Amino acid sequence: MKRKRSCWCCKKYFQHQQDLYHVFIDFKKAFDRVLHAALWATMKKYNISTNLIQVIKNLYNKATSAVFFNSSIGDWFRTTVGVRQGCLLSLTLFNIFLERIMTDAIEDHESAVSIGGRTITNLRFADDIDGLAGAGEELANLVERLDEASTAYRVEISAEKTN
């Protein structure tokens, strides 16, 4: 998360003597769970150039993997899930995919958190999410909706690391 951004939100709410509830959400192996088909559809939905989508698809359509186990490499197979580790494009692709999940989760969600006239439900950096709410029930509802939306895209919230 951007340095001190959550702290700034807290400070503003404390200054105005308003309740602010947080939940820090962690996904299990988030970058490994990006569904390629959903990513391409999301890019199209967000009006990203079809030529650019095709170039990225070509990079990923040729991607193969193999499992190294007991000092030997297994059979090679095509990958249809995950973004490439170490690739400069991976964070951007992940953010596009996560935006789809978050949009589905917070669609029609009423949030009591407002700063500078803007309604805020979450702060994000890569796969780190700070869910925000003005009441405990509202926060629980946000987490439930996020869990449903992420499960639909085969991304799992880590109960152990979410607090």
Residue spans for each PLM region:
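Nucleotidyl polymerases of mobile genetic elements and RNA viruses
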Residues: 1-163
